[in-house]
Structures are given as structure tokens and as C-alpha cells.
Amino acid sequence: MYYGERFNSISHLIGAVAALAGLVVVVVIAAQQGDPWKIVSFSIYGTTLFLLYTISTLYHSLRGRAKQIFRKLDHLSIYLLIAGTYTPFTLVTLRGVWGWWLFGVIWGLAVVGMALEALPQKGNRILSVLVYILMGWLVLVALKPLLEALPFAGFIGLLLGGLFYTGGIVFYLFDEQVRHFHGIWHLFVLAGSVSHYLTILLYVA
């Protein structure tokens, strides 16, 4: 394993461990409150977060055929995490018509995105990124009800996380041309995850 891949695997191994601990924390908080919506939504969110970092760690640690399989799983897990991150905001913060509408649309897009990702054709990277961006910023259609339901500091945390993820895409797109760009992408992903997790912990839980 060359240095870049070592960094990629270790950085997301740290993310996986943190995600598992974070999952336990938010689910315990939800259980103590006895809120089934929080228990379900936090479980979905935390599980998708843990899956993404675990799969990414394995992808960057393996070689040969196994690496190719986990590369595909790595891409699929991105759709799951985006939809999983929306889940607490839609089922707990918004709920109602806006919450359920956004919940249905975002998970529908996740299914469509994963279906496209599973196709054997190559060269779908740009299309995948466009779907990531569409899913990530779809929340803006519910901006007004979200601002009414979420404290402003929570909205800033949500926005900041989105900016980290989106800003990192530049490094993701050119990671095959420039060495270590993929590692920088990983740092942006970690920053986005931390921002969104803290927002959920402090303003949704």
C-alpha cells in the first residue's frame, strides 16, 4: 500500500471509529428521551455514516478484485449517507408535509443514484457527482420551514457541512490527475461529517 492509500485508509478508519461512537451517543440520547422518531432517524443516520467510513477504509486497504468491488460499494454508500443525513432533519426537525415530502424524494433519489452507479458502464463519474450535489442541496426547497424549525446556529452547522462536502468535490474530481487530492477529499468529507453530526447532536437530538 503506497503512502497515499495508507493515509486514505487511516483517515477514514478514524472516521469509522468516531461514527460508531457517535451512533451510540445519539441513539442513547434518543432512547432516554423515549422519542421513537429520534431513535429511528438517528439509527439510520448513524448506520449510514458508519457504513460509509467502514467501506471506504476497506476499499483503500484492499487490492485486486476485492478493491474493485469495494470501490463500487464506496460509491453506493455516498448516496446512503446523503439520504441518511437528511433523515433526522426530515423526520424530527421538519416532520409534517415538508418533512415527509423531502424524506421520500431524497431516498427516492438515493435509490435512483445507486441504480445508476450499479450499471456496468464506465464514465459515469460526472453524472454521479451531479446527483450528489442535487441531493445535497435539495434541502433549499424547504429553506423557509427549515429555518422556522431549526435554530439559526443549527442551520449554520448544516450549511457549513454542505459547503465542506461540496468544496471537497473539486479534489475528488481531479484525484486521478493530482497526487494526494483524494486524501484532501477525505479531509473535507470528515469535516462535513463532523459539522453535520454536531448539528444533529446539539440542535436535533
Residue spans for each PLM region:
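Multi-pass alpha-helical transmembrane bundles in non-GPCR membrane proteins
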Residues: 1-205
